[in-house]
Structure formats: structure tokens, C-alpha cells
Amino acid sequence: MLLVVIFGLVALFALWGVLRSVRNKNILGFLLAGATLFVFGWFTVMTVINSGYPTAH
């Protein structure tokens, strides 16, 4: 359960980074934050689908 929360928080911070880098016209920041958002967002979704929330034993 804690893993989903951590992945979700990282994905939210990455979303904030994407929006901030677009506003500042920072291409490298956009690419890195976008990649982080994609990876951790995918991990969050797959962890919820696989393990459920709260975690099913």
C-alpha cells in the first residue's frame, strides 16, 4: 500500500514539473519530467490494478 502512495506522489510531483517546465519554456525539463510522469504514472496504475488499493493479500 505504501508503494502505491509513493509512486502516486512522485507522479504528482512529475506532473507539477511538466506544467512548470512548459510555463517556463524549458524543453529539457519538460522531457525529463514527462518521462518521469510516464514511468511512475504507469507504475502507479499497474500496482493498483495488480495489487489493489488497499493491498489485497
Swiss-Prot record:
It is a multi-pass membrane protein. The keyword Transmembrane applies. It is found in: Cell membrane. The keyword Membrane applies. The chain crosses the membrane at residues 2-22, 29-49. It comes from the Bacteria. InterPro entries: DUF2759. Pfam families: DUF2759. One of its GO terms (cellular component) is plasma membrane. Keywords: Cell membrane, Membrane, Transmembrane, Transmembrane helix. This is Uncharacterized protein YqgW. It comes from Bacillus subtilis (strain 168). The lineage of its organism: Bacteria, Bacillati, Bacillota, Bacilli, Bacillales. The gene is yqgW.
